């Protein structure tokens, strides 16, 4: 079991800063490094008790565990590769919370060669250390993961998702894909609502319609996701009472209405094309989850 009272933190952007403040509140001794020392977040962490170290090697050598939270993997490679064989990293554990692809995480394990966990943070900086926050972790093994769980749990619910270094990134990006898909549809809906003619409810504003109608509708649909996922697991795409042929006509009506009302529905158009392809190539009596067969390469 590693002693986790001393932690180093590399990268003090919005996310790194939130992670750092949560660690300080948990009474950790924190050594911090950031490319730009003059960033106000550096001052805020030093004021809260962190020690700023201008040298990256010293920062890492100061604690058994170092958290990395920078912009992207090319940045990690740029700052860490030059010191990867130095004494500073010997016997250290790295927890990388930088967003990236599964392949980038696997490649990092290759060139890093030290103990490294890769993480996906399912939280915005404001959510860190609240019940809404959870963190996927992968790499090494579950036993070694248990030696760093007490750090991860400072920020949110810790979920170990496997030894494959890329597993956390895959889970993280899958959730974000769901989020951006939802945003794409929701923002198209908001644009359409914005086009309401005077005399209708546009004076109440888009926000009240989103709160009063769109959000309850999306919330009511969440169990449908689980039913679609079950179809995907079984490879049998029942209609679930809503055959894709019927849904495809509804989708075409959305695209047509957007054209008529002056809304760009491009973010839905590609998906509508996939639905049409399923209808054209299959019976059209199955469910919308059958689209997944066109996505899997
Ligand atoms: N913020 C969010 O909502 C999400 C929540 C989920 C996780 N993401 C990922 O976390 C990584 C860091 O995100 P961030 O929000 O902290 O990002 P920024 O505020 O833009 O800070 C970027 C830090 O990266 C440093 N940096 C950038 N380029 C370099 C470089 N060439 N060399 C050294 N450091 C670099 C930057 O340093 P500086 O500009 O202050 O000198 C910041 O410390 C990210 O992967 C998210 O996807 C956030």
Each predicted region: which residue ranges?
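Hydrophobic beta-strand scaffold residues
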Residues: 30, 52, 116-117, 265
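NAD(P)+-binding Rossmann beta1-loop-alpha1 motif at the extreme N-terminus of oxidoreductases
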Residues: 1-68, 92, 154-160, 191, ...
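A general structural signal for well-ordered alpha-helical segments in protein cores
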Residues: 42, 63, 73-76, 105, ...
């Amino acid at each position: 079991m590693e002693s986790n009272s001393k932690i180093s933190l590399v990268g003090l952007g919005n996310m790194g800063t939130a992670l750092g403040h949560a660690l300080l509140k948990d009474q950790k001794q924190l050594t911090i490094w950031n490319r730009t020392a003059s960033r106000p977040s550096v001052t805020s962490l030093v004021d809260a008790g962190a020690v700023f170290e201008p040298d990256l090697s010293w920062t890492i050598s100061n604690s058994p565990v170092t958290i990395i939270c920078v912009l992207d993997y090319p940045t990690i490679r740029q700052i860490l590769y030059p010191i990867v064989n130095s004494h500073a990293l010997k016997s250290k554990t790295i927890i990388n919370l930088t967003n990236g692809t599964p392949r980038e995480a696997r490649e990092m394990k290759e060139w890093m060669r030290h103990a490294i966990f890769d993480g996906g943070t399912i939280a915005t900086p404001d959510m860190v250390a609240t019940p809404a926050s959870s963190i996927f972790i992968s790499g090494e093994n579950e036993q070694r993961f248990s030696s760093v769980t007490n750090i991860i749990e400072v920020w949110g619910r810790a979920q170990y998702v496997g030894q494959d270094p890329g597993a956390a990134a895959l889970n993280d990006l899958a959730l974000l894909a769901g989020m951006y898909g939802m945003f794409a549809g929701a923002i198209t809906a908001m644009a359409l609502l914005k086009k309401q003619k005077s005399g209708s409810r546009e004076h109440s504003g888009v926000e009240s319609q989103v709160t009063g109608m769109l959000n309850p509708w999306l919330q009511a649909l969440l169990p449908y996701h689980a039913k679609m996922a079950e179809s995907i697991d079984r490879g049998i795409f029942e209609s679930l009472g809503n055959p894709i042929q019927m849904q495809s006509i509804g989708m075409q009506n959305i695209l047509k209405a957007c054209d008529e009302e002056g809304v760009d529905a491009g973010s839905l158009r590609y998906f509508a094309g996939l639905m049409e392809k399923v209808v054209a190539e299959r019976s059209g009596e199955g469910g919308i989850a059958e689209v997944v067969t066109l996505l899997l390469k």
